[in-house]
Amino acid sequence: MRRATFLQLTVAIQAAVAAAACSYDRTRPHPLQARRTQMAHLLRRAGFGASRETLDEFQRMGLTEAVDRLLNYEVIEDDTESRLKMISLDVRKLGDLQRWWLLRMIYSKRPLQEKMVLFWHGLLTSGASKVGLPNPTPQNPNPPHHLLNQHEFFRRHALGRFEDIILGISRDPAMMIWLDSQTNNKGKPNENYARELMELFTLGIGNYTETDVREAARAFTGWGLENGRFIFRPNNHDTGVKTILGKTGNFKGDDVVRIVLQHPAAPRHLARRLWEFFAYPEPAEKDLQPLIQAYVTTDGSVKAMLRALFTSPAFYSARAYRAKIKSPVEFVVGAIRQLGVATDAFQLPGATTRMGQALFNPPNVAGWPGGAHWLTSTTWLERVNFCNALVTARNDGHTMAPPLAAMLERYRLSTPEAIVDFFGDLLLDGQVSPAMRQTLLAYLAAGPDAPLPSPVELTAGRASGAGAALRLPALRPTFVDQKVRGLAYLMLASPEYQLA
């Protein structure tokens, strides 16, 4: 494909998704004024979307109860580990390690815990490309699994105190290898970790100087690894006086973390990163203030900050609704969770990687850029191909067919309108434009050989056959197998579904 054509297609895709963000009927009350839509929004952002049963359950709750349910996940018994034990996985291999986490995201009853692990994985990044994976030898048959251990650290501390998280990640072997902390020696300090600690993890550009970085790097000297575990070597530590962010003393590495987190930019930086991950980009100062206040009054509790975020009116505003493009992981996991598909995730690491997100292997220290970067002509095609593979799965030993017939029977869906409205509610919050609805109804009523409209035509309501007389064939297996699968595909591949 010529570069100009490639770029034109990418722009067209991004424009279609942007248009979808504004496609709901603005003459009607905003979607987030309805409790059901609020809950669907909350479950997408604080998790990966929800099945019809879970959405019904949360709709019966008040907002406070729903947020409490998500935040206090430790009281929820989760049987994901027992499910994982039934699948043969060797987490020393990157593909199986990715499958292991994707399965946790798909089947966990604690979706916010997994979403927060994904947040920390993108902020406090480390990757297999440099950290490596365990390589047993006769001399060392059980080497430590640094990436898995870091991952479990994030899970244990997902909603903990920010200081505990930063202190822990500073000594984490995967992070030390990723940013060369183990080579930080007296007389020749390595500035990598000190720089990223301030720039990416805690303060942001403009809130520190190059001198602060150099002095902090001196404080981290003496840190190293021995047999894959953190060790402090006093003889390799610079014991001289350092001045960091205006404070002077004979500081060590842990002192640097505490000094940095006492800076007023630290709570604001974390508040902004949380807001942009869960709500929308470029928040106003008034959006961040409740989170900053929660940080200050609770000694840096991430749980308190998220409670402030998930109960903020701005989180349920028009600006927040469908304002983020789903990451590949959110897209894949969400579709599987919402349709109730049973899978061993064998093909999912390849799918998310081709879409631009290889878990445990971010592109660089800044993680994934996200936003519009998720959608190019190539990654859009991968999303469409995934949707097709998911809805046409026929029990291939890895992914079971979506239980579409069971859904129709359980919810007594026997008319074209009922079927379209059911899946529109499940996948698109019921925000199906009249043009899209008419196109979908016409598709259901057309013969089995009728072509599928394209996702973009679906949004525009331009598919041939729109407006035709609608008659539902008897709910024969062939109708479910062909037409209802196609309907699910069209909604999953639509520009609207790409938005979280």
Question: Locations of the language-model features?
Answer:
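Alpha-helix C-capping/helix-to-loop hinge sites
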Residues: 46, 104-105, 123, 127, ...
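N-terminal secretory signal peptides and thylakoid transit peptides that target proteins
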Residues: 1-14
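Extracytoplasmic/secreted proteins, especially bacterial periplasmic and envelope-associated proteins
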Residues: 34, 38-42, 50, 54-57, ...
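N-terminal accessory alpha/beta regions
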Residues: 52-157, 182-183, 444, 450-468
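Charged, compositionally biased N-terminal leader segments and the immediate start
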Residues: 6, 26-31
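Flexible, low-complexity segments enriched for small/polar residues
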Residues: 30-35, 39-52, 263, 267-298, ...
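A general structural motif at alpha-helix termini
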Residues: 10, 59-62, 71, 169, ...
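Active-site substrate-binding loop specific to GH73 endo-beta-N-acetylglucosaminidase modules
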Residues: 7, 17-23, 134-354
